Amino acid sequence: MSSDLAGLDSLGAEISRRAAAAGVLAIWRCQERSVRRVLVRNGRAESTSAVSLGGHGIQVVNAEGYGALASRDDLRAEPALALLDRVIDVAARGRTLGLERVALPELRPEHSHLPAADPDSFVSIDLAQATRRLIELESEIRGRVSGVTVQVSYRAELDSWRIFRSDGSDVWFAMPRCTIGMRATSAGYGSRHGVSAVVFDSSPRLFDDEASVALYLKRSEAASRLARELPDAAPHPSGSSPLVIDYALAKGLAHEAFGHASEADSFRSSVLASEGRFRVGEEVGPEHVSIIDEPVEGDHAWQPFSANGLARERAVLVDHGKLSDGLSDPWSAVSGGVRLTAAARAESFHHAPQPRMTNIRIEVDDPLPAPGEFEGYGPEQVRDLLAGAGVFRRHPKIAYLSGYSGGQVNPATGDFVFHCKAIYDLSPDGVEFFKPAIFSGSMFGALQSIREAFGPLKLDAVGYCGKWGQSVPSSGGSHYFLVLDEHPTVRLGGR
């Protein structure tokens, strides 16, 4: 699959030579992507698809700070060189066109080749075989839990990039992303609830991997049982209360609240910035809490290099309670008052890169133990963890928010609204089950109220993140569970 990217040495060198002769910085982004999908419902394939795309985008910035970007859906040499000439011409007319000027950054040349280890395994996927396997998995799930409708899905994607810069940089990397997912919906009349589960891997054969399938079935069974039980649950009372959230909801808090507000291209309106500059050193949380974003190899959102051809760096957004790094690219770091963390990502070669997250987590110093795997913890086991740590001596009743079902944050104010999958009131007397409710409030109040963490870091809460018309993979998490003390700015909805 990556043969076209492998043969770009001469063309990349010529583009760099011409850009240098014209006195511009040029970034040439070449991409090939293969995506295979299967969706199964009621024992048959509802849809299958196989999509491949390839092409390139050229971005230039001249000495005056005017830039332009253009793209083509092929990798042919003559059209690529002609496109370069046109982009250079547009940038040269930047003042007349009213383009915004940017500072021409000084970048460190990069040279690294990390192509896909087995690209043929992606383009040779047998969709008929994948469909048969998904039908088997759907049947297994339906056999374990009755009373729900089940939809199962498979996606295998290989996203390969080669990025040249006119300073001689040449980086080539491939990002394999494969998932099997399911959604269970309560059947019958009245209120209906849907609950999802997903497992990811870098191999397109994950539906035949014993460990992946076992985890998938365990998560799918739990999701199906929850979907079946939710219609009969009562609504949770509204108000502020102490909370326990799991790693998936913690990822949502880190990503939606602090992550987006830390993206340097948003500092003009971010609650974490003043007059366009990140408020480095300002206290926003307790000393034992940090928020970190970095690429994790093998992860769903792994990206080792930015879309500008720079090695992506670990960014500590909140370092033991204080603002530290922003998520920046060469054009936003200096103006935003943060160091360059090479956080730029692009959905495709057509798009202009933007500072984005990869794998983001909330990390707490000295977490308490939570033995075993996360999937072994139901509400009763979470209650036992809290009891063993003496949390009930501080809070006689705690609301456990299980799972994450999306949400949004206003990065200008820090106000958030999140959705969980279910709520359980935990107390020394037992467990009470409720429908999910809105979890809302101030991101500062939520972070300040984090008191304890249980278990190791778990970073496999995956999804896709949209920003300015671009969608890129995201992932992250936290420790198995976080305990949040009651805070007046954080509340649960309900009736």
Locate predicted features.
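Acidic low-complexity segments
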Residues: 1-5, 10-12, 17, 25-37, ...
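Dual-mode signal for accessory low-complexity, basic/Gly-rich regions
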Residues: 268, 276-495
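N-terminal alpha-helical targeting/anchoring segments
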Residues: 34-92
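Structured beta-strand/loop patches that form or line metal/cofactor-binding pockets in enzymes
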Residues: 21-56, 147-171, 396-419
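Extended amphipathic alpha-helical scaffolds
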Residues: 128-214, 259, 264-292
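Internal alpha/beta scaffold segment
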Residues: 67, 74-100, 175-261, 319-325, ...
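Short acidic, glycine/serine/threonine-rich loops at helix termini
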Residues: 37-43, 158-176, 192-199, 253-259, ...
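A generic local secondary-structure boundary/capping motif
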Residues: 16, 46-49, 126, 138-144, ...
